Every structure is written in C-alpha cells, then in structure tokens.
C-alpha cells in the first residue's frame, strides 16, 4: 500500500549523513521523510566517541557555516575540547572534541524532532521504486510504499554487512543491528558499480578495571574551543581527561603469534580497510620496527563506565583481544565489555555520481556517506548536507549546487570521490587541498554562509550574526589602518617594547600587526591602539587577514587561473576516441571517468598536461569549447 501523503525528499538511514541530509532538505522548505530502522539510534556514534581532527574539523565547520547540525550537537555533547596543531599556522589548526555518546545522540534527535517539514518513520527499507531510470519512492519491510521526487541513500555499513570476530562471522549492519540485505540486492540490480570495503572498531573496556594512577593524563584546552560559529563554551557539559598507555613487545608477540586466527590475514575478509585508521594487527605488521604504539583511553560519556581504547581496532578472536588489552600498562586486570570487530559492507563507485552526489544513471537518486567509500562521521555529515540540499533543489526544480575545490574541503572531498573514485575508505586531510591557506577552519563561515543563505539553509539568526561579524571585521581593519604612531610620539616607547626592531618611520596599526612578533592582543593592549574587539571571532579574522594578506593574495591568483580550467566544460556524451592525438590509456580513462570539466580531467591519474592541451585544441576546432558562468 502507498502512504497517503507524497513527500518531496526521502532520506534512507539515520546516521551522520542521513541526519544532515534530512535537516538540510527540511530547512529548505521541502516535505522530508527520514526512514530509519531504529529511531533510538539516530545520530549514533558507531565507532570512536569524537568529532573533528585534522581535515575533519574543517568539514564540521563548513557544515556549520551552511546551517548544519554536527557542530551544534558536539558543542552540547563534548566532554573534552582541544585545538590540534595549535602552534602551527591557521591553515592546519583543527578542533577536536571527545563526545558523550548519549548526549550527542540526544542533541541530534532533539534537533530532528523539532525541525519543521520533517517526518521520522521507523521501518527498514527493502526496495526502491524506479520508473524509467527515475527514482520515485521507497518500499519498507512491511510493504509500505512512500512516494517522493528525490531519494537520498545514507545507509552506512548496513548494505550486506558482515561482522567478523576471529574466524567467525555473521550478518550485521553494526554490532546489535541487522544488515540491509534486500536493499543491497536491489541496488545491485541497478546500473551501478559496487565493491566491498572494510572497517573496524576496538573492544570497549570497563573503566573500573583500569589502573589510571599509572597512566599519563591528557586534558582539554583552557579556554575551551567551540565548534559552531553560533556556539559558546557555556554550552559544554562537564569536561574530563583522557589517558595514555602504549602497546609493547608482549602485545606485539601476542598479535604475531595469532595472525592465523585473524580474518584479514587468513583471507576471510576481502574488503579493503582504511589506510589511516589501521587495525592493531596491521600496525604491528606494517611497522615492524616500532616497539610500541600510543593508545588513547577515551571515556565514552559522563554516565558510562565504558572506555574506548583508540588505537587497537581489531578483528582477532575474543581470547586474543583479552591478551592484547591486558598486556598494556594500567590494563593488567582490565575487562572487556564489548568485543572489537571488523565489518565488511557494500559501497558504490562514486565516479558514477555527479558532483551534486546525484547518480548519473538514476534521476533523483543521491548517495552520501560510507556508501560512497568514505570513512568518518565528518565526511559523512558533509556529504549528507550536500546530497540533502541538492535533493531539495531537485524536488523544487531548481539548479543544483556543488562547491569548488577552492571554496571548501567539501568541494575537495566530492571532487576527489567523483573524479578519482576510491579503492579504500577515504579520509579527509588538509594535505588533500591545494588551497588550504584559503580553506581554514576559522573562515568557513566567510566562505560559505552567504551561499548557504542563497540556498535557503541559513536562518535569520545565523545570518544576522554573520553580517555583524563582517561589519566588525571591516570596521576594525579600517580603524587599524587609520591609526598611526610615529617614532617621536610619546606612545612609541610602549610600542617599541613589543618589537624586535624599533620604529624608524610612521606605522599604522596594520603595519605593526604584520610584524611576526606582534599579536592582535598585544597591539590592542597598547594605549594608542586600544580597545580590542569584544567579538573574538572577528578579532581572530582581523589578525589572520592582516598577517597573511600577501600569501592569501598569491593563492587567490592561483585559484583564478585554475578556475579557467574548472569552468571549461566537457560534453557528458563525448566519446574520447574521436579526439585524435590522445593515447589509448588517456582515451580509456576519460571514457571511464566522464569528467565534467577540463579541471576534473586534469586530476585523473595518467591524464597528462599534453593530453589536456590536445583536448582543448580539439574542442576549439569542433566549436565545443564553452565555459560555465
């Protein structure tokens, strides 16, 4: 039977991608349905209890700048906040927070349940309704049919999921949840390329059985950072420390002696695991010269006794897991409350997607999260927001949107996936972005909030705060430009006390701030340049914009040159065998990837600059050379 009311957008799956997709579509005014197998696990942190980190924190800030949920949720649930790379330049600084799993899940569910235009329904989805290569709805396990103009798949590791502990395995979407086998079979019937990936999680430890007195503590930062541009530290719950222990030779011997019982090394697992979050088995074998590995003992929440031992993800048998855990300092009497495991699951080749995350083959069908080959809550959330907003725009018959690589880490993420694909779980790093000086955490709102407002994602409160911040930045920069001090002035001595080279000529506040030894706080503590801005976010922007002005201008020039290639479009139906002068390898790769632009084509491995030149000449001769607006 059909549900009585049609929807504009259906989201299938209630993890980090699904919740952002649902919130985005509903915020844009579209009637949105979120289908989940269990309402109680909306926003569940299936693996590590943390948000952010290098590259990942940048994505969270971008999601927030577009009006998303993740940053707000972690500000309400974070029990330890830190700035990573705090001593380095602003481009690579990143925020990370330990999370209370229960508080995080509660924050997400509360936001969803209070979002207008959004209905949540608990039923597993077993089928899609596809008519003439166009998705028009979904079917649940009890045969209930829902119609919609667009469908977003955010099903995580549930598609034909298989859990491995030692040489034993069983079907599961994650521990305690069933897999989605009928939907997996249905998707395999569609013209989509599918493969298998693997991820894993460590055993959870009873905190009452750990001797923390012999372990080093790791505390959060003070003052505490915040994730959301709309947040403040007063929202944070009680803060707690993490602890550090290490593996040792005994640990490594236990692992080496039991590799024949590892499903990975016994050939039972075929899926490829994450390169940058390897299992402890992989670490011991790949880094055989290391006699120890650092392990972070992270609390799972303020009301939980469970500890997440970050660094010992494993699928070895339970008895071996016990030996591994008890071989480490402070853990000699530790008890495991949940075993570690590996999980294999289906993912679909993201090269079959447009940069909007819509399928190239099924109109109105969008993919986001681990189904696209990524790993991590943050990568999933960013994709979910993009897929949700584009599903909403499709249902409203509006032009879709995707950020450029020069505009956002989300743009880098989507371009990497859709252009290059992935053979292993993809994780975001700052090193993946060629314009990372422009793509900082601190300016995510300056880069994206205006676009978010145009798209209908940003509410009035955020928009007003954003404009207030812009005005504060502009006003303060003008004040510093127009405030001067001369070497003969009475205030010169106070200024010189902060300089390595005394003033030799008249200088403005901006001139002084450009000096590496002068901070904004120091400058505005001087009588001649006081007072400091009360708006701390605006003050941070003033300092960064002034100090890095020359570098930023050079990078902007590079971006403008690159945009000429990005905006040179390639026909979707072009058969590259027609282009004389291209090698067979280049022809095969271009026909396989079907790049949307010269810029995308240039990033395909094996497509040389010479091949790009040949292609540009051919397009011009054929009268097919055109650029997007």
Curated annotation (Swiss-Prot):
Name of the protein: tRNA uridine 5-carboxymethylaminomethyl modification enzyme MnmG
InterPro entries assigned: FAD/NAD-bd_sf, GIDA_C_N, MnmG, MnmG-rel, MnmG-rel_CS, MnmG_C, MnmG_C_subdom, MnmG_C_subdom_sf
HAMAP family: MnmG_GidA (MF_00129)
Gene3D superfamilies in the cross-refs: FAD/NAD(P)-binding domain, GidA associated domain, C-terminal subdomain, tRNA uridine 5-carboxymethylaminomethyl modification enzyme MnmG/GidA
Disulfide bonds: none
Protein family membership: Belongs to the MnmG family.
One annotated Gene Ontology cellular component of this protein: cytosol
Binding site for FAD: 13-18, 125, 180, 370
Family matches, as Pfam families: GIDA, GIDA_C_1st, SAM_GIDA_C
Alphabetical keyword list: Cytoplasm, FAD, Flavoprotein, NAD, tRNA processing
SMART domains: GIDA_assoc_3 (SM01228)
GO molecular function per UniProt: flavin adenine dinucleotide binding
């Amino acid at each position: 039977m059909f549900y009585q009311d049609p929807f504009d957008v259906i989201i299938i799956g209630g993890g980090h991608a699904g919740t952002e997709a649902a919130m985005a579509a509903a915020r844009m005014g579209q009637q949105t349905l979120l289908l989940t197998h269990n309402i109680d696990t909306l926003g569940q942190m299936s693996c590590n209890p943390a948000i952010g980190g290098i590259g990942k924190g940048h994505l969270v800030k971008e999601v927030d700048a577009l009006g998303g949920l993740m940053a707000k949720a972690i500000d309400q649930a974070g029990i330890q906040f830190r700035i990573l790379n705090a001593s380095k330049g602003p481009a690579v600084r990143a925020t990370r927070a330990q999370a209370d799993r229960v508080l995080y899940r509660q924050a997400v569910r509360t936001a969803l349940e209070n979002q207008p235009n959004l209905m949540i329904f608990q039923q597993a989805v077993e089928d899609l309704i596809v008519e003439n290569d166009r998705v028009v709805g979904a079917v649940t396990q009890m045969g209930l049919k829902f119609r919609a103009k667009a469908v977003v798949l955010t099903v995580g590791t549930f598609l034909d999921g298989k859990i491995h502990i030692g040489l034993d395995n069983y079907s599961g979407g994650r521990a305690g949840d069933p897999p989605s086998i009928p939907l997996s079979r249905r998707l395999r019937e569609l013209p989509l390329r599918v493969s298998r990936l693997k991820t894993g999680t460590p055993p959870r430890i009873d905190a009452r059985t750990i001797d923390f007195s012999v372990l080093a503590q790791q505390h959060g930062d003070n003052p505490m950072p915040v994730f959301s541009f709309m947040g403040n530290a007063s929202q944070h719950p009680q803060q707690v420390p993490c602890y550090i222990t290490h593996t040792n030779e005994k640990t490594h011997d236990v692992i080496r002696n039991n590799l024949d019982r590892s499903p990975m090394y016994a050939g039972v697992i075929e899926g490829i695991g994450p390169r940058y979050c390897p299992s402890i088995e992989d670490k011991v074998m790949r880094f055989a010269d290391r006699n120890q590995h650092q392990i972070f003992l992270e609390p799972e929440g303020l009301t939980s006794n469970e500890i997440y031992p970050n660094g010992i993800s494993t699928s070895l048998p339970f008895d071996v897991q016990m030996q591994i855990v008890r071989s480490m300092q402070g853990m000699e009497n530790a008890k495991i409350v949940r075993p570690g495991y590996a999980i294999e699951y289906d993912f679909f080749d993201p090269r079959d997607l447009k940069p909007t995350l819509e399928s190239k083959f099924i109109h109105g069908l969008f993919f986001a999260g681990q189904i696209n080959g990524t790993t991590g809550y943050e990568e999933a959330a960013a994709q979910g927001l993009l897929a949700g907003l584009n599903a909403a725009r499709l249902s409203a018959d509006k032009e879709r949107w995707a950020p450029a690589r020069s505009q956002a880490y989300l743009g880098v993420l989507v371009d990497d996936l859709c252009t290059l694909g992935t053979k292993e779980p993809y994780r975001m790093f700052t090193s993946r972005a060629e314009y990372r000086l422009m793509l900082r955490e601190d300016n995510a709102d300056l880069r994206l909030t205006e676009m978010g407002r145009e798209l209908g994602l940003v509410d009035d409160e955020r928009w007003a705060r954003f404009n207030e911040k812009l005005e504060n930045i502009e006003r303060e920069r003008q004040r510093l430009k127009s405030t001067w001090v001369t070497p003969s002035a009475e205030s010169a001595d106070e200024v010189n006390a902060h300089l390595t080279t005394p003033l030799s000529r008249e200088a403005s506040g901006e001139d002084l701030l450009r000096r590496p030894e002068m901070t904004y706080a120091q400058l505005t503590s001087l009588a001649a340049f006081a007072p400091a801005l009360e708006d701390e976010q605006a003050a941070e922007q003033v300092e960064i914009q002034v100090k890095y002005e020359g570098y930023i201008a050079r990078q902007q020039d590079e971006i403008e040159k690159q945009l000429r290639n990005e905006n040179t479009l390639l026909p979707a139906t072009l058969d590259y065998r027609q282009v004389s002068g291209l090698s067979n390898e280049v022809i095969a790769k271009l026909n396989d990837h079907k790049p949307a632009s010269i810029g995308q084509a240039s990033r395909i491995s094996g497509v040389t600059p010479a091949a790009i030149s040949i292609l540009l000449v051919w397009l011009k001769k054929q009268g097919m050379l055109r650029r997007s607006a």
